[in-house]
Amino acid sequence: MNKSTLPDQFPERYRPLARLLLQAGEENRVYEGNSLEIITSGLRKRELLLEDIRRAKSFIHMEYYRFGNDRAGREVRDLLLQKAAEGVEVRLLNNNLSYWLSIPSKYYRDMTRKGVEVIPFTHIRHGLGTWLYRINHQLHRKVVVIDGQVAYTGGMNLNDNYFYKWRDTHLRITGPIVEGLNASFMQSWKDSGGRFCYPPEHYAPVPVAQEAPLRDKLMQLVSDSPEKPSSAMLEVYQWILDHARDYVYIQTPYFVPPQSLLDSLAGAVKRGVDVRLMLPHKVDTPFMGTTNRAYYQDCLKAGVRILERGGEFIHSKTLVADDEVSVVGASNLDWRSFFLNYEINTLIYDRETTVNGKEIFLSDTMQTQEVKNGSWCRFMRLFYRML
């Protein structure tokens, strides 16, 4: 299938959305014939990821916003070192601030000395000395590709919070979309000054033997970067809200929406769509709880239902709509994800996946309280934009 064409079975209703994303960049391709597992437990991701790493024969590509020097990070690190000793190519692209500030440099030097290539995301096209650019524009993607056969992406970084403490959503994927995720990694690696041992075809996807009925998911990558004139992910949220008929349920840990997104939320409710936002009651980042709530009043006045989830911190970034389309990704509903960071998300055009996602959302609702009062400090909007 041509990169810019849509498969015959693509749902007519969502063709304008898919084409809109393709116009934004050919990396936002549609892939047919995929299979996936929705992961909502860090322990489940740990189990699957470690097993897939153990099976690796050719290469392991990882890019993370956070790769911890803790129980989770060291467990994965030790296995990566083992695979490197076996001759597997192992590459880790880490967000620059995490690389420089969060972990002692010896941690990464030891990995590199023992065969794991580790470099910070620097985006060399803007110059290695552009300190401000590197600080302000972060690699927020969470991607693993193993042997071109299996990939992971979503909201989970790699440290103890994500494996053992928080509630998050991630995907394990097989099928043609793995090629797109690997291409994204390879471009970021090269942009950061990294090299490859072999020509690109060596890292091409390898077919996976699997029953045909399991590989029926239509998926589209949605990639964002500060170099683009507009945010593809913001377009996705607004398009779905503007065209929804029944419901749109959204989970995000951070909520600092531009006015255009607030307008789309309000417009959907005005048409009779059931719009719900789920956010954490307690946020992991100072001031962000208050900043989130600075937007509640506008949403509540429009009729959007806001649910704050107690218990463990919910870091999930998902959308489900009309039992037809869903999103799982790394992007928050905030200015930084839309306009400043390097992000990647998956758009899934599939009824079974969306219904499953809706059931997960409703299950999470059991630990929420609905917000009725939105009279919070609006000045926090200005504070956030200064960060």
Question: Which residues does each PLM region occupy?
Answer:
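Charged, low-complexity intrinsically disordered terminal segments
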Residues: 1-387
